[in-house]
């Protein structure tokens, strides 16, 4: 619904504008059902007990799409301890993501904040020159109140 609201505003082209990317994740905290919506965004990563899965959308950036219905949500299932990683294209150039998967796998026990910082630092070492954003979410069971 939010995409239907904002898409028309971004269709109004500004000279030199390449389009606006959208990377969104919704999680039902009771069931673990999740949905990822990617419109021109860099790949995201889901770390589960079975390894790391790269999630890449085929949808154009907002403003370049003809209709919001072009955006296809990616259905996911998250369990306790799973990580979801979103990166801006300044961090992930999309060509070689082996280094991202390696960091996420090796550092899965670290805090989400530390994993995000490590991803940005590694991108800087790789010579990334664009703005860099990393968001890492870990799904955890609620701890009982003491």
Show which residues each predicted segment covers.
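Residue-level structural signal for beta-strand termini and adjacent loop
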Residues: 39-40, 57-58, 100
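Catalytic core of PPM/PP2C metal-dependent serine/threonine phosphatase domains
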Residues: 1-49, 71, 123-129, 136-137
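C-terminal catalytic subdomain
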Residues: 3-4, 9-10, 23, 77-87, ...
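Short, flexible helix/strand-to-coil boundary loops that buttress conserved ligand/catalytic motifs
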Residues: 38, 48, 66, 98-99
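Amphipathic coiled-coil signal-relay and dimerization helices
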Residues: 34-38, 53-56, 145-146
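Short, glycine- and charge-enriched coil/turn segments that flank and shape catalytic ligand pockets
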Residues: 30-31, 48-52, 105-113
């Amino acid at each position: 619904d939010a995409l239907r609201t904002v898409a028309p505003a971004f269709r109004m082209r500004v000279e030199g504008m390449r389009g606006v990317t959208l990377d969104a994740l919704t999680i039902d905290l009771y069931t673990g059902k999740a949905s990822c919506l990617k419109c021109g965004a860099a790949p995201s990563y889901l770390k589960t007990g079975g390894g790391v899965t790269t999630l890449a959308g085929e949808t154009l950036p907002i403003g370049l799409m003809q209709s919001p219905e072009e955006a296809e949500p990616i259905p996911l299932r998250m369990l306790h301890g799973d990580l979801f990683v979103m990166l801006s294209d300044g961090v992930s150039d999309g060509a070689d993501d082996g280094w991202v998967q390696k960091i996420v796998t090796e550092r899965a026990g670290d805090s989400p904040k530390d994993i995000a910082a490590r991803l940005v630092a590694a991108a800087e070492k790789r010579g990334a020159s664009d703005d860099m954003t990393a968001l890492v979410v870990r799904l955890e069971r609620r701890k009982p109140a003491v």
